[in-house]
């Protein structure tokens, strides 16, 4: 799924259902109050030496306040502990299944590297694009959907216009859904400048901006001239393909009529900007290096990432085209194309630069959409998957692995096991959660996640803690999408910084000069003028307060104090550091602050 950064039509989405948010927070708050009360009781028992009653409370009669505590111990052991132990065992089973899935994927990736397996086009490398008749240069439509992306539109348009492909054989569509008149004017002027420099590029703006990104792409595909093109490459507004992108992706389609999609991996211009971007980089490196590559090699199927990919237009049409029914139109079209028998290729060695969200607020909203959308899609696609005439193992892979295990079970057990059940077992010690579940296997899984980005090894502990912290957002999103709560169907702006715009345009200038024989790269003067102009109305950055994260921080720190009384070392340290992680996130002390 792509980190889509636009907002189409309607009001700005808060990213989650207000009803679900309030109920979820009320549940966490009640749990915190209960845990504090239990901690007070346990502290009193510890001070008075009643902790020895735990072994004899079921047999020996006691009197006074001590008898009340003994009654609580009997009730806890008889009624509470079995229920919590059942929940614990169920979550541990899910945890082991998911860990086994992750391990198998890592072994598949290791096998790919060991055997040096990679997709190779059946045709040889393409010669210089100046001679389009010398080789395979099919007609390619290049689309840049965007919406109010003032910070990044110049670099994406410049990068796409400098693609090394015969000018007569590709057309750029700038699909601008901006509702800001100033942004519309800037983008329209940028397109005009490239047109004047010889680029085949058109500007499209919709009056009725329905359907979000899917509606934008669907509208663009309805143009009469699209019938003249065989393939369509899609780049979100913050993506900057290298000049040889089409030369390294399109040849895979030649003599391979079953191939519907070629997907490239992402690289990030701001991965070292702050701790938040470093942790995101770990996650996404694993996603591309392991998940996408393994599924592409062994299954010829994976979720389309929404950008930096080339589709065969026939495959899009055969699969029903772009649909606006969910907020994950990229995954939607990929699943439908897979059900129609189309194959996918993932190119791990072809990279396309983009940006990572630098603030926690932007990242949280992005993750909410990424985890609510698949649940919407699962509800809609399940009947089609069951009725589809594909082989059984492909149906099983889609239902049990692609959707249930990786999109539903993972966020469910992560939140439930480490944020709910683990604290509960501290106050109900008769229900046990083994050390290897709390520490050893999560550490191993984090180590596997970090292998595709070995330079990130020093961040392994922050990564583990932050992933557990994000589980509250992912769990909330999953429930929202599964039960169609609130604004699960709304888009959320992902703020972009446009950090590399001027440098990238300058680096593209020689390429543009070489092909078009012009005097200067478009809009460099405008950039310089904008930078020299005095800035007005500079907005102050501030920290947001996230109540759910702060409440969970208090819960985990309370449980840590209780585990200290029980002398449970590993549990204490895990709860302590996890509680601190929730505290830092709740105070918005990770990543850039928002304006």
UniProtKB/Swiss-Prot annotation:
Q: Where in the cell is it found?
A: Golgi apparatus membrane
Which family does this protein fall into?
Belongs to the glycosyltransferase 2 family. Plant cellulose synthase-like C subfamily.
Stated name of the protein: Probable xyloglucan glycosyltransferase 9
Topology of this chain in the membrane:
Multi-pass membrane protein
> Sorted alphabetically, which keywords does the UniProt record give?
Cell wall biogenesis/degradation, Glycosyltransferase, Golgi apparatus, Membrane, Transferase, Transmembrane, Transmembrane helix
Binding positions (substrate) = 236, 238
E.C. number(s) listed in UniProt: 2.4.1.-
Q: What does this protein do?
A: Probable beta-1,4-glucan synthase rather involved in the synthesis of the xyloglucan backbone than cellulose. Seems to work simultaneously with xyloglucan 6-xylosyltransferase. Xyloglucan is a noncellulosic polysaccharides of plant cell wall and consists of a glucan backbone substituted by xylose, galactose and fucose.
The active site consists of 177, 330
Gene Ontology MF, one: glycosyltransferase activity
Spell out the Gene3D superfamilies in the cross-references.
Answer: Spore Coat Polysaccharide Biosynthesis Protein SpsA, Chain A (3.90.550.10)
- Signal sequence region: none
Q: Which InterPro entries match?
A: Glyco_trans_2-like, Nucleotide-diphossugar_trans
């Amino acid at each position: 799924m792509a980190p889509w950064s636009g907002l189409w039509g309607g009001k700005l989405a808060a990213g989650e259902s207000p009803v679900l948010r309030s109920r979820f927070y009320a549940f966490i708050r009640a749990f915190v109050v209960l845990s504090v009360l239990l901690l007070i009781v346990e502290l009193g028992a510890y001070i008075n030496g009643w902790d020895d009653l735990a072994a004899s409370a079921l047999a020996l009669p006691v009197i006074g306040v001590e008898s009340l505590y003994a009654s609580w111990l009997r009730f806890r052991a008889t009624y509470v502990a079995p229920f919590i132990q059942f929940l614990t065992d169920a979550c541990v089973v899910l945890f082991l299944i998911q860990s086994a899935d992750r391990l198998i994927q890592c072994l598949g990736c290791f096998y790919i590297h060991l055997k040096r397996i990679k997709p190779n086009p059946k045709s040889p490398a393409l010669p210089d694009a100046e001679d389009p008749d010398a080789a395979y240069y099919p007609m390619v439509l290049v689309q840049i959907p965007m919406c109010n992306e003032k910070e990044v539109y110049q670099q994406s348009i410049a990068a796409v216009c400098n693609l090394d492909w015969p000018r007569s054989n590709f057309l750029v569509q700038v699909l601008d859904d901006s509702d800001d008149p100033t942004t519309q004017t800037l983008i329209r002027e940028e397109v005009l400048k490239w047109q004047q420099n010889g680029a085949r590029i058109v500007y499209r703006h919709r009056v009725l901006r329905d359907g979000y990104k899917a509606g934008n792409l669907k509208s663009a595909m309805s143009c009469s001239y699209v019938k003249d093109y065989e393939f369509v490459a899609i780049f979100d507004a913050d993506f900057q393909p290298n000049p040889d992108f089409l030369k390294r992706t399109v040849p895979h389609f030649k003599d391979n009529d079953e191939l519907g999609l070629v997907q490239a991996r992402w690289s990030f211009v701001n991965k070292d900007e702050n701790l938040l971007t470093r942790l995101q980089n770990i996650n996404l490196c694993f996603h591309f290096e392991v998940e996408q590559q393994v599924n592409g090699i062994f299954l010829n199927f994976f979720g389309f990432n929404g950008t930096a990919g080339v589709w065969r237009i026939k495959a899009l049409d055969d699969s029903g085209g772009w649909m606006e029914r969910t907020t994950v139109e990229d995954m939607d079209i990929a699943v439908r194309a897979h059900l129609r028998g189309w194959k996918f290729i993932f190119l791990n060695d072809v990279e396309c630069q983009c940006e990572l969200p630098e603030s926690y607020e932007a990242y949280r909203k992005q993750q909410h959409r990424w985890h609510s959308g698949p649940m919407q899609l699962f509800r809609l696609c399940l009947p089609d998957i069951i009725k589809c005439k594909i082989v059984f193992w492909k149906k099983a892979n889609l239902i049990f692995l692609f959707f249930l295990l990786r999109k539903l079970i993972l966020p469910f057990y992560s939140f439930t096991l480490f944020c709910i059940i683990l604290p509960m077992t501290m106050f109900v010690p008769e229900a046990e959660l083994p050390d290897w579940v709390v520490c050893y296997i999560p550490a191993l899984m984090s180590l596997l996640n970090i292998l595709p980005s070995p330079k990130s090894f020093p961040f392994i502990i922050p990564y583990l803690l932050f992933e557990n912290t994000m589980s509250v957002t992912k769990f909330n999103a999953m429930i929202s999408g599964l039960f169609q709560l609130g604004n699960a169907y709304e888009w959320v702006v992902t703020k972009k910084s446009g950090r590399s715009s001027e440098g990238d345009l300058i680096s593209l200038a020689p390429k543009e000069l070489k092909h078009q024989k012009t005097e200067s790269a478009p809009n460099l003067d405008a950039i310089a003028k904008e930078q020299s102009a005095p800035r007005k109305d500079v907005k102050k950055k501030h920290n947001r307060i996230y109540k759910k994260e702060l409440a969970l921080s208090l819960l985990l720190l309370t449980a840590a104090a209780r585990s200290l009384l029980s002398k449970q070392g590993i549990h204490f340290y895990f709860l302590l550091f996890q509680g601190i992680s929730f505290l830092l996130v709740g105070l918005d002390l990770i990543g850039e602050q928002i304006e």
